[in-house]
């Protein structure tokens, strides 16, 4: 008999994968532009390209992770849903959990996705 995922398990898996991919993309953009500037000796990039690269990394990471684990626009209610997501940083998730703005039940899979995504993004 094939085990079935519950609705909560499916949501947790989606949030985990969203944080993993979003953090991975953030680190790929950021570390990639720093490596380009450093390895070229400043000929192919400087402080401006590094800052733009990190900014684009945050933008793309939030665009990837936000719709899955973040605030979504609800056309029926004409308001944002109350879910918080697209942290892309373990310090953000942990500090929000400490001030009780983020559920402790979601903290483990958010942190796991962020750490694994950061490892993969910096490795690539």
Tell what function each PLM region has.
Residues 1-124:
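Membrane-interface helix-loop junctions and terminal tails of multi-pass membrane proteins
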């Amino acid at each position: 008999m094939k085990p079935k995922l519950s609705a909560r398990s499916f949501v947790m898996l989606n949030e985990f994968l969203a944080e993993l991919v979003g953090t991975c993309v953030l680190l790929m953009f950021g570390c990639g532009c720093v490596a380009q500037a450093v390895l070229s000796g400043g000929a192919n990039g400087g402080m401006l390209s590094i800052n733009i690269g990190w900014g684009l990394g945050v933008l793309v990471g939030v665009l990837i992770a936000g719709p899955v684990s973040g605030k979504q626009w609800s056309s029926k209610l004409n308001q944002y849903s109350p879910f918080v997501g697209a942290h892309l940083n373990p310090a953000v998730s942990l500090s929000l959990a400490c001030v009780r703005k983020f559920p402790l039940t979601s903290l483990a899979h958010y942190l796991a996705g962020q750490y694994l995504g950061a490892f993969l993004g910096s490795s690539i």
